[in-house]
């Protein structure tokens, strides 16, 4: 019997050569890319020759897209670690709760560095290709695409090509992904290549070939892609084709949803990765409400930039009666248009006390709708335009916290200085002092017992049920950055003990050995664990590990982020 990959390749190529162009279709999918009757021959690259950016064999695992000006980590990043240890850690990375951890993981995976050691006889994917796949998993689509592009022309197996293909399918226009499919016909035996080809045929309006491609996949016993089959059927006129689908969506499914001008079902949307959510948000083929919902979720998890969400908010149009009182409309409306109205309400106010007040009102509504974090990030440029004045100081605490979330420490400090001279709420400096200290601002008053005691007393008055937990969190964070808060210590309430966890034990050992790259990946694993990611002692242990591994600034960023997430 003919071997499966050979049969699949021959069948697909024969299908492409023999199939006639699709007939014109009345109510068929919109043609997003030009149709094609033949496959372009794959580009031939001489192995081992450096030509037009092609990597020689000894260079491909070292490939990266950063330099020191753009945040690259040392070239010895992976020294002392092994592929056997690192590959499972890279395979498990996710966007996570903390932007600071995601950023240091991004820098590690995107930095050019000597690869870790491999055991004799180990057969593993290219390390650079594995790093590109990790970048895609944490939602860094552009970085994944750039790194995969660098190595895909040389890579003999499918890992880099698969990453590149998925990253390209996440773009609003599927044409580059389909060009990549056509340029890599040598991979026709790969199931995902065959699925990608069907997607390209379907979005081009060539449903006859798409159906034939699915039939060939069934004949060759390629694992069924339930969503792909359903989406082709939907485009072919079956209105209920999506009913009952339960599998997870993948990047190559999104162009088909856009071509059908339909949103993924709610259950499927809720399970999308940050990269896929950002893709839906950026794709004009989806309805604006769908795009805003996707952007809000992606922005809240730092999977998308807040400015992209701001642009979507700004693109929503309103009736004159709605424009007359956007805040009232937002309070009554429940959907994405309500958040767009809030944004427009804030933007309509001149920078100054009026905008500060409008932002405070908008945040209250956004918090009730469950999108407060995303809305803050979307409105950050509007907040930065508000000049620090005594007239707007009543909102300084909210504005400082918003600025610190996006690391605008200088602007936040100017608002704090306004509070220090007596403007705004009397307890403002006590509330904000520890946050600015964690942000790296040298505050002489933080050396005074009165400042910390005032902060502790405020927590007891403002939120009694959470006061003790917040005091423990601040004590743990200050201790982790090397500034023990003696005035907050209580002999009857010692610092919480570090949880007994194999993840924490492994992180501690790795940091002690100064294995920078492995420490970063293990820190991400700790803070992805549900029982650890909000635990004060676990967060503090992670900060200490990063500091010991030579990443003190990143540890401090994590401390500030954890404090803000805990409501300090």
Language-model region placement:
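Residue-level signature for tetratricopeptide repeat
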Residues: 134, 163-168, 200-201, 402, ...
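Extended amphipathic alpha-helical segments with heptad-repeat/coiled-coil character used for oligomerization
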Residues: 176-269
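Terminal, intrinsically disordered low-complexity segments enriched in charged/polar
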Residues: 26-125, 298-349, 442-517
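Solenoid-like repeat scaffolds
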Residues: 70-80, 109-120, 146-156, 181-190, ...
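Long, internal scaffold/assembly segments composed of regular secondary structure
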Residues: 229-412
